Regions:
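Glycine-rich phosphate-binding loops that contact phosphosugars or nucleotide phosphates
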Residues: 1-99, 103-113
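A short, charged, Gly/Pro-tolerant segment at domain boundaries
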Residues: 112-130
Length: 130
């Protein structure tokens, strides 16, 4: 949502079939970011593979780099993961992913900041209009 408010055309897709269809429709001007803490989520890896075949830039956020993923990922961003946190008793295992997205967002907003801030203000104004 924050990237959309900054003027980017963003889709967040979790359905495996839609992920593959969207990946087939991207092109060289697109960036596809896949998230799999285990690095083994077949649906995510398949989607990234299809996106790479479509000439998109491909990034994987993971805590575990599986052999071969570097063949279809332009960048692999490792995030922290503590074993057994997936039961939700302490800190969410997704916390490191949220932090990484905050870092990426801050970096993106810092470059050509005035234009992006204006787009952000425009989108907020559009939401407030009745």
């Amino acid at each position: 949502m924050r990237l959309m408010r900054a003027g980017l055309d963003v889709d967040v897709v979790t359905d495996p079939h839609i992920m593959k269809m969207r990946a087939a429709l991207v092109d060289k001007d697109c960036l596809v970011i896949g998230i799999s803490l285990s690095g083994k989520t077949k649906e995510v890896l398949d989607c990234l593979h299809v996106a790479k075949k479509s000439n998109a830039k491909v990034v994987l956020l993971t805590s575990n780099i599986e052999p071969g993923v570097d063949k279809f990922c332009d960048e692999i961003l490792r995030v922290a993961y503590v074993k057994n946190l997936d039961f939700g008793m302490k800190v969410s295992p997704q916390l490191s992913i949220l932090i990484m997205f905050d870092i990426l967002y801050a970096y993106y907003m810092e470059r050509e900041a005035s234009a992006k801030i204006q787009k952000y203000k425009d989108t907020i104004s559009a939401l407030r209009e009745k």
